[in-house]
């Protein structure tokens, strides 16, 4: 059974956390300021987290959030109809922020593995009650712009956004398409390196 380590940032006054991930109870431990749990890896790399946090004063709070890992769940097919019909894709919320944050982290790690210097700071544990500040949204936007600028992208790759203000469904699609394109380019670069190196030179 493969495992995945989840990490959630909660208020500093929290001293104990319990709860479930995808319906199963796990042990949570405070490590370097974040509450972590090692869980069974989900096939789709999606984790529905329902922690209960307790303060030293005995105040208990229930949280609910969804964490994403990798790129399996990126969304690029939002439509005007989603907005009009108010479907899940017609709103931009904590789930979207977490999905993109996790994908930014994943792509940044791939860049680092190929020797790129990467400076991004994605947040992946937004909860439904969070209201992002202007500064947090700018960091969110800048993370994407930073990654996109590291490579010569495809002609069809969307431009990075200039602002998160008044985000449209097409811009939301573009954010996630950029990440998919970067991932594909990194894969192609890795394959090209292997094919031009010694892997096919009969020495392996």
Residue map of PLM features:
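Short proline/glycine-enriched turn/loop motifs at strand-loop junctions of beta-rich domains
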Residues: 10-16, 21-23
């Amino acid at each position: 059974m493969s495992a995945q380590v989840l990490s959630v940032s909660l208020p500093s006054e929290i001293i104990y956390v319990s709860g479930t991930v995808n319906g199963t109870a796990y042990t949570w431990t405070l490590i370097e300021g974040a509450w972590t749990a090692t869980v069974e890896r989900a096939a789709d790399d999606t984790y529905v987290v329902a922690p209960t946090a307790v303060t030293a004063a005995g105040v208990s709070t229930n949280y609910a959030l969804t964490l994403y890992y990798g790129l399996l769940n990126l969304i690029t097919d939002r439509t005007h109809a989603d907005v009009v019909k108010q479907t899940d894709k017609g709103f931009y919320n904590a789930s979207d922020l977490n999905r993109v944050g996790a994908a930014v982290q994943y792509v940044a790690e791939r860049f680092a593995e190929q020797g790129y210097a990467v400076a991004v700071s994605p947040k992946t544990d937004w909860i439904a009650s969070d209201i992002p500040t202007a500064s947090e949204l700018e960091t969110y936007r800048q993370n994407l712009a930073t990654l996109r600028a590291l490579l010569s992208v495809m002609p069809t790759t969307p431009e990075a956004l200039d602002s998160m203000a008044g985000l449209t469904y097409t811009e939301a699609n573009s954010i996630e398409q950029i990440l998919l394109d970067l991932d594909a380019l990194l894969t192609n670069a890795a394959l090209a390196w292997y094919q031009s190196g010694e892997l096919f030179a009969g020495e392996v």
